[in-house]
């Protein structure tokens, strides 16, 4: 028997969300369906009973998958089957993971798998905004330990009005697009892009989102109570020795605090911290360490964390010796590589990005074929994080989720600065060569520099900064950190990235690890971030006051032209013959498409002459021949009665033997005209029925003195008469124009 339980959430605008459990996937630890309109997601959670031996972290795995059948489509590819996760699916996984992960108990180390699947969609409501709610609700109806519930919503500002979970159409018109994850009481995660908005406007969007989330969390608690899952399973994943914990603290804390306040570099500081714990472990035998090593590592990590936090809260001293508002030293180099179309190095402290820009044509557009999004992207940003950037000795595998997420943040920070009518496809590639925190923000800064070096006329330069937080007593005592290090991110309470121009914010990403973060702290963090952003922007402008006024010599050139829709077929030709010929003859690349009832042609090449040649050929094709005009032409074939001349691309006319010269020729061979020869011709007439062109060469030549116009051919007169009175003229022999009638 089914025991179906459901709750409905009213969004207050005529729409509602239904959460249901007890019908599908009943063997999972928890399973719910979330329905909004015709959009249906299934979320399931399963957890191992015991932790893996030696595991000291939260092994959470979140998967999000969209079925093409949800919208009635076939997948692409040879197999016609869903394959590896798309970038969009990976980004949705990360949004859910970042909101859930901090709320599992610190000492819970069993593997947890969260799967969210889109089974139905209508192309109107956005399913990624429901994935966090679905995942949390599945945990709520399970017995897996979880300090939730949470929910996630998207908030967009459209025409000055904040909308919760907007439609695809509404989002296209929004100047604020925020995804917010939160519990009933606290913001946990924020990510979004904006069109140069003020800090207060972004905060208002977060407030609107949190109010909607509170309603959704309440519905989950009611659902959990209805299915009797308020009591969670018992577990014991850590072995503790309180005497050992105290011993580690007593013997290591003072030395760790000294290292935390020494102001040394990343590797020197790491070695100093490592030396302390190694000397502590030296007092134990190998047999004792086999039992205690894992606990010692865990307790010493807590000592390091406490030392760093106390140094900041009590003395205002950071690990590298900076003040809380201080930005690391910055050095910049642009035009550093001869091959790319644009390049820049941005180094901030021990974080360095080498970023390049490649300019391409329409054929370089990226085709996006997601379930609910079929489009082409003209601005790409790729972020690479090789192991050597942190000094790690391990192989470099494929692109990971972290790289996709960091690249997406930098992409959103810069994309609104690319002019909408920019003719080039732009690819920005950031290779992180050194990393000690804020590498995604270094990518934004280096991306701005490289784009300007490439001659891309971006609307405004963009800079970015990562902020941190150290707090205690529910946020009553706190310190906000500008331009955080990797250790400050790891040991702190917040990672808050903000990008923007001098006029406002373009993108943000925030992850909070503690309860009780007030809006006052967020306001202060945003204000401090603004000061940091503007400082970094000043350094960028010092190094590169202006955008390069032209592209580099080896960058492709692009010209656009518009033609009537009716000429598109003529330019392409049968089987693409004409357009391929244009490309072969000119050396340029030609792309054509119909836009708003017009043919839009993009001509690109490595130099201006090849582009001009292609443009000339296209103009010739679309040009309308005018009677009386003179055209340069080329003889394409020679016939007994005259020559065919191509006087415009794709347009041929007959040059009759009688129109070659004022002189009379008996045969076409007497004219000495050859196939392939170039001559000038004048268009005499266009047949109104057949559209055939009648050409003349002789009218362009000077008429000989004493020239007498030939008399009308007798043959034609007699032939007309013959049609009335019979065929009585001689067909054989004699001059063609003076044939004698038969006896």
Swiss-Prot record:
KH domain span: 556-618
Major site of localization recorded for this protein: cytoplasm
Keywords, in A-Z order: Cytoplasm, Magnesium, Metal-binding, Nucleotidyltransferase, RNA-binding, Transferase
EC numbers: 2.7.7.8
Cofactor(s) required, per the database record: Mg(2+)
Family annotation (Gene3D superfamilies): GHMP Kinase, N-terminal domain, K Homology domain, type 1, Nucleic acid-binding proteins
Domain S1 motif as annotated: residue spans: 628-698
Listed name of the protein: Polyribonucleotide nucleotidyltransferase
Organism: Porphyromonas gingivalis (strain ATCC BAA-308 / W83)
Lineage, highest ranks first: Bacteria, Pseudomonadati, Bacteroidota, Bacteroidia, Bacteroidales
Gene name in the database record: pnp
């Amino acid at each position: 028997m089914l025991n179906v339980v459901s709750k409905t959430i009213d969004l207050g605008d005529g729409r509602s969300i239904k959460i249901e459990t007890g019908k599908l996937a009943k063997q999972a630890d928890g399973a719910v369906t979330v329905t909004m309109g015709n959009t249906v997601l299934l979320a399931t959670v399963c957890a191992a009973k015991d932790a893996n031996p030696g595991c000291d972290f939260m092994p959470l795995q979140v998967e999000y998958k969209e079925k093409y059948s949800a919208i009635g489509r076939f997948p692409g590819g040879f197999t016609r089957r869903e394959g590896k996760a798309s970038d969009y699916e990976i980004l949705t996984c990360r949004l859910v993971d970042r909101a859930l992960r901090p709320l599992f108990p610190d000492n819970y180390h069993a593997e947890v798998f969260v799967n969210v699947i889109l089974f139905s969609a209508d192309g109107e409501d956005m399913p990624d905004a429901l994935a966090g709610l679905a995942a949390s609700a599945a945990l709520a109806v399970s017995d897996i330990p979880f300090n939730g519930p949470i929910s996630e919503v998207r908030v967009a500002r459209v025409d000055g009005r904040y909308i919760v979970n907007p439609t695809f159409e509404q989002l296209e018109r929004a100047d604020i697009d925020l995804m917010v994850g939160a519990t009933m009481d606290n913001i946990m995660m924020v990510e979004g892009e904006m069109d140069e908005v003020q800090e207060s406007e972004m905060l208002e969007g977060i407030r609107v989102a949190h109010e909607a989330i509170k309603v959704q969390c309440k519905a989950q608690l009611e659902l959990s109570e209805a299915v009797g899952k308020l009591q969670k399973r018992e577990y014991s994943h850590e072995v503790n020795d309180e005497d050992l914990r105290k011993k580690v603290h007593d013997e290591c804390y003072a030395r760790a605090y000294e290292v935390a306040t020494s102001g040394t570099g990343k590797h020197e500081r790491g070695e100093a911290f490592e030396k302390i714990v190694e000397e502590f472990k030296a007092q134990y035998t190998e047999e004792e360490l086999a039992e205690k090593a894992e606990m010692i590592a865990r307790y010493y990590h807590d000592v390091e964390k406490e030392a760093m936090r106390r140094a900041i809260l009590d003395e205002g001293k950071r690990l590298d010796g900076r003040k809380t508002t201080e930005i690391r030293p910055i050095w910049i180099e642009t035009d550093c590589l001869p091959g790319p179309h644009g390049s820049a190095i941005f180094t901030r402290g021990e974080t360095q990005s080498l970023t390049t820009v490649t300019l391409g044509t329409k054929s370089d557009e990226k085709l996006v074929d997601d379930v609910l999004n079929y489009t082409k992207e003209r601005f790409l940003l790729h972020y690479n994080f090789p192991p050597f950037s942190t000094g790690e000795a391990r192989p470099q595998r494929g692109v990971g989720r972290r790289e996709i997420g960091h690249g997406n943040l930098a992409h959103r920070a810069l994309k609104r600065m690319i002019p909408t009518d920019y003719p080039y496809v732009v690819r920005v590639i950031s290779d992180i060569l050194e990393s000690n925190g804020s590498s995604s923000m270094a990518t934004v800064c280096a991306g701005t520099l490289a784009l300007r070096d490439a001659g891309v006329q971006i609307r405004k330069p963009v800079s970015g900064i990562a902020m941190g937080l150290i707090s205690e007593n529910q946020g009553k005592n706190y310190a906000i950190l500008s331009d955080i290090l990797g250790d400050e991110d790891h040991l702190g309470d917040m990672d808050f990235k903000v990008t923007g121009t001098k006029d406002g914010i373009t993108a943000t990403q925030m992850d909070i690890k503690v309860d009780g973060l007030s809006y006052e702290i967020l306001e202060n963090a945003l204000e401090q971030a603004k000061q940091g952003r503007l400082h970094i922007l000043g350094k960028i402008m010092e190094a590169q006051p202006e955008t390069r006024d032209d592209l580099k010599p080896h960058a492709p050139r692009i010209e656009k032209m518009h033609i009537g829709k009716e000429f598109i077929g003529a330019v392409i030709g049968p089987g693409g013959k004409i357009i391929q010929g244009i490309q072969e003859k000119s050396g340029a690349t030609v792309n054509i498409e119909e836009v708003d009832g017009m043919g839009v042609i993009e001509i690109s090449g490595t130099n201006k002459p090849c582009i001009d040649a292609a443009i000339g050929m296209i103009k010739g094709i679309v040009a309308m021949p005018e009677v009386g005009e003179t055209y340069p032409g080329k003889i394409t074939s020679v016939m007994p009665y005259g020559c065919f001349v191509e006087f415009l691309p794709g347009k041929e006319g007959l040059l009759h033997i009688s129109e070659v010269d004022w002189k009379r020729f008996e045969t076409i061979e007497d004219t000495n005209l050859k196939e392939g020869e170039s001559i000038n011709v004048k268009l005499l007439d266009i047949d109104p029925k057949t559209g055939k062109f009648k050409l003349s060469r002789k009218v362009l030549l000077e008429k000989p003195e004493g020239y007498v116009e030939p008399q009308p051919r007798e043959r034609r007169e007699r032939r007309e008469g013959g049609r009335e009175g019979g065929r009585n003229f001689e067909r054989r022999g004699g001059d063609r124009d003076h044939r004698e009638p038969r006896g």
